[in-house]
Amino acid sequence: QFQAQEEAARLIAGLSLVSLALIFAVLYSRYRSAVLALIIMGNVPLALIGSVAALWMAGQAFSVASAIGFITLAGIATRNGILKISHYINLALFEGESFGRELVVRGTLERLRPVLMTALAAALALLPLMAGAGEPGKEILHPVAVTIFGGLVSATLIDAFLTPTLFLLFGRAPLERLMAARHDQREVTAF
């Protein structure tokens, strides 16, 4: 049994790396920028911190089930960054906002409610699984729920400051490239 569990842990670790690589590839293909993809993926370590803290507070050991929760959480955590970065880009491209603090503050405030609503909905959905830790049938789902809940809380709270700050520090060049590409595309379609 120990050997099977160790093999499953190796498989989950490999799948985790593959899922992170795929998330990066999708983000890169969407934004054409490694910088923007990495800013968005900056939420993943923050989510993992919250997950580990939640597992520790719940008295849960790291398991294959919690590792599956980590993989799920990586996708959920990137969603918040995607919402914000996409909105910053749209404000610049379609509403003529220039890069700067005003764009980032406006974009962050306009996306705060949707981010909080989706995080709250997910957290509320996980509460029944977290409440009955010892009940039959929840042995597998409880660690997954604890992992996702803890990571969701930490990623949502810290992301409110991290993504805007990183975009302000490193987002100017990628945004200008996207704006130039859109301008070039308009000129080509005009002819």
Residue ranges and their predicted role:
Residues 169-187:
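Membrane-proximal cytoplasmic C-terminal regulatory module of class A 7TM GPCRs
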